[in-house]
């Protein structure tokens, strides 16, 4: 079965891998997936990622982050927009995640940015996912 929502597939793979405490997870390469992983790395939710090819298809190996007691840095990661239901927000109505402890990832005219950056730059956009 073909994957129609690469972002949702990526979020599900990260969620499942962190729950069973895998060191890393392989994801399909796409520009939006890479942009989301850049934000997760900047915010400390993943250690980093590597891009590799397998039989002509590009993949990303995301290295997950855990604390000293092997608790995952990502407690919850949820998709907000789906292919069948896009959710948009202006910068004035940008929701807060876990009272400011989580992050919101937004696709805007400035690229893929966090909800805080969207408020600071006064741009709205499509709400991709929330992480805490």
Curated annotation (Swiss-Prot):
GO terms for biological process: translation. Keywords: Ribonucleoprotein, Ribosomal protein, RNA-binding, rRNA-binding. GO terms for cellular component: ribonucleoprotein complex; ribosome. The keyword Transmembrane does not apply. Disulfide bonds: none annotated. InterPro entries: Ribosomal_uS8 (IPR000630), Ribosomal_uS8_CS (IPR047863), Ribosomal_uS8_sf (IPR035987). HAMAP family: Ribosomal_uS8_B (MF_01302_B). One of the primary rRNA binding proteins, it binds directly to 16S rRNA central domain where it helps coordinate assembly of the platform of the 30S subunit. PANTHER family: 40S RIBOSOMAL PROTEIN S15A (PTHR11758). This is Small ribosomal subunit protein uS8. The lineage of its organism: Bacteria, Pseudomonadati, Spirochaetota, Spirochaetia, Spirochaetales. The gene is rpsH.
């Amino acid at each position: 079965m073909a994957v129609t929502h690469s972002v949702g597939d990526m979020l599900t793979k990260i969620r499942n891998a962190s729950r069973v405490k895998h060191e890393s997870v392989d994801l399909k390469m796409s520009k939006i997936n890479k942009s989301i992983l850049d934000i997760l790395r900047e915010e400390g939710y993943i250690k980093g990622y590597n891009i590799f090819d397998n039989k002509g298809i590009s993949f990303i190996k995301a290295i997950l982050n855990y604390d000293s007691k092997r608790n995952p840095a990502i407690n919850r990661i949820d998709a907000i927009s789906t292919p069948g239901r896009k959710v948009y927000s202006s910068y004035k109505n940008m929701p807060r995640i876990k009272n400011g402890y989580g992050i919101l990832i937004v696709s805007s005219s400035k690229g893929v940015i966090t909800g805080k950056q969207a408020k600071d730059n006064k741009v709205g956009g499509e709400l991709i996912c929330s992480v805490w």
